[in-house]
């Protein structure tokens, strides 16, 4: 009877590990196959992803960009156009009541000029000056722009520190006295003497309101050189209204 031999070598299956010595580890090679895993995220996601890829490949990826809402894009229309109705109303009161004793900060008309307020005043004055002739509107606006430019250049020559926008705003707002006397002239138009006095009063009112804002202390003895052309400018505005 033969003695029992050594037990047979254990052959590992696919699910077992095989331990080898470090000397034999250098001769080992192989690969691990990745499992085929598929996720079903729905047909809509696949279509959207395909469309996105298609657009990006052809340079239209900017169509897919989503911008955050900017609070500045939701401003009211008046704010977008830089129209401050309260500021315009305050400036109108400053022009119509130029007396310093009333306590208005009249320098705001000069120091904080705007465009829409004077433009509205000039357009309103043009409308009441039509007399069936629409070309009067464009003519009055032209006189406003170039008349203000003349006053601006004269003020700069005399040494005044004033901008063209400031002159444009002051001259435009100061047309308000002529607008105020317009309905009065319709009533007393048949009385020549009274009508003439009202016209002179309106011109002096407008010229004083504009000159008191534009003529500063820097002019000193040169004030008449600037007040006189302002007075002539409003006489011309009045002549466009009365048809003289």
UniProtKB/Swiss-Prot annotation:
Q: Which Pfam families match?
A: Yip1
Task: Give me the segments passing through the membrane.
Answer: 114-134, 139-159, 167-187, 196-216, 224-244
> What tissues has this protein been observed in?
Expressed in keratinocytes (at protein level).
List the GO terms this entry assigns under cellular component, sorted alphabetically: endoplasmic reticulum; Golgi apparatus; intracellular membrane-bounded organelle; plasma membrane; trans-Golgi network
For whether the record's keyword set contains Transmembrane, the answer is yes
Its GO biological process annotations read:
endoplasmic reticulum to Golgi vesicle-mediated transport; vesicle fusion with Golgi apparatus
Entry keywords, A to Z: Golgi apparatus, Host-virus interaction, Membrane, Transmembrane, Transmembrane helix
Q: By its UniProt entry, which InterPro entries does this protein fall under?
A: Yip1/4-like, Yip1_dom
**Protein's cellular compartments:** Golgi apparatus, cis-Golgi network membrane
What's the protein's topology in the membrane?
Multi-pass membrane protein
Which residues does the entry place in the Extracellular compartment?
135-138, 188-195
Q: Which residues lie on this side of the membrane: Cytoplasmic?
A: 1-113, 160-166, 217-223
Disulfide connectivity? none
To which protein family does this belong? Answer: Belongs to the YIP1 family.
Primary role: Involved in the maintenance of the Golgi structure.
Could you describe the subunit structure of this protein? Interacts with YIPF3 and YIPF5.
Can you say what this protein is called? Protein YIPF4
Organism per entry: Homo sapiens (Human)
This chain is encoded by the gene named: YIPF4
């Amino acid at each position: 009877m033969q003695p029992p031999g050594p037990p047979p070598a254990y052959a590992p299956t696919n699910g077992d590990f095989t331990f080898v010595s470090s000397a034999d580890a250098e001769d080992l090679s192989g690969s691990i196959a990745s499992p085929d895993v598929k996720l079903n995220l729905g047909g809509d996601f696949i279509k959207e992803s395909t469309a996105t890829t298609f657009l990006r490949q052809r340079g239209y990826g900017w169509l897919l960009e989503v911008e955050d809402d900017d609070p500045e894009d939701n401003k009211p229309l008046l704010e977008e156009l830089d129209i401050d109705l309260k500021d315009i109303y305050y400036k109108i009161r400053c022009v119509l009541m130029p007396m310093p004793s009333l306590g208005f900060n009249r320098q705001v008309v000069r120091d904080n000029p705007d465009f829409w307020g004077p433009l509205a005043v000039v357009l309103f004055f043009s409308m009441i000056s039509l007399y069936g002739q629409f070309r009067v509107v464009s003519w009055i606006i032209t006189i406003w722009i170039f008349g203000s430019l003349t006053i601006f250049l004269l003020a700069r020559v005399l040494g005044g520190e004033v901008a063209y926008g400031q002159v444009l705003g002051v001259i435009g707002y100061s047309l308000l006295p002529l607008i105020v006397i317009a309905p009065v002239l319709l009533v007393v138009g048949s009385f020549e003497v009274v009508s003439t006095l009202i016209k002179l009063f309106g011109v002096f009112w407008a010229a004083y309101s504009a000159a008191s804002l534009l003529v500063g202390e820097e002019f000193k003895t040169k004030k008449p050189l600037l007040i006189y052309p302002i007075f002539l400018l409003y006489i011309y505005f009045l002549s466009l209204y009365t048809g003289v």
